Regions:
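Short, Lys/Arg-rich flexible segments
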Residues: 1-84, 89-93, 98-144
């Protein structure tokens, strides 16, 4: 059986060890960069669908848009890093939760047609978020 052996350059191995030591600093920054791209797409789509196609004039208070945000990067129970784009709770005053209102807008209800904004924003932002995360990772690796 043929056998090949490769030796990695010493400077490359040093850079990998420095990268390993700073992973917990770098990963949240990279995910935050991607999360901001997704957040802007969701915010744009939400603005486009609120008040559109209604029978009566819109009574929107922009409270749903104001509650939209990005969570800090955290390790989940599987050991993977997550960042979430979603709505803060609770809503000011009385009424339904932000998640319920977003769900009604996204999927509709009896007498109210669906106006998807999350699914469309997710699909539209995928490439941009990947590019932003790659750029941020390259920037952080370049600092090593």
């Amino acid at each position: 059986m043929a056998r090949a052996e490769f030796q990695m350059p010493e400077d490359f191995l040093d850079q990998l060890s420095r990268l390993e030591a700073r992973t917990d600093e770098i990963v949240p920054k990279v995910l935050a960069a991607g999360g901001e791209v997704v957040l802007e797409h969701v915010r744009t789509r939400l603005r486009a669908v609120i008040g559109q196609g209604t029978k009566s004039p819109s009574r929107s208070t922009d409270e749903l848009e104001a509650a939209l945000g990005v969570s800090p990067a955290r390790l989940n129970r599987n050991g993977d890093w997550d960042v979430k784009v979603g709505f803060a709770e609770p809503r000011r005053g009385k009424g339904d939760s932000n998640a319920k209102i977003a769900n009604i807008i996204e999927f509709g209800k009896h007498g109210q047609p669906p106006r998807p904004f999350l699914k469309v924003a997710k699909a539209a932002s995928r490439d941009g978020a990947k590019a932003a995360m790659i750029d941020k990772l390259d920037e952080e690796v370049g600092k090593l």
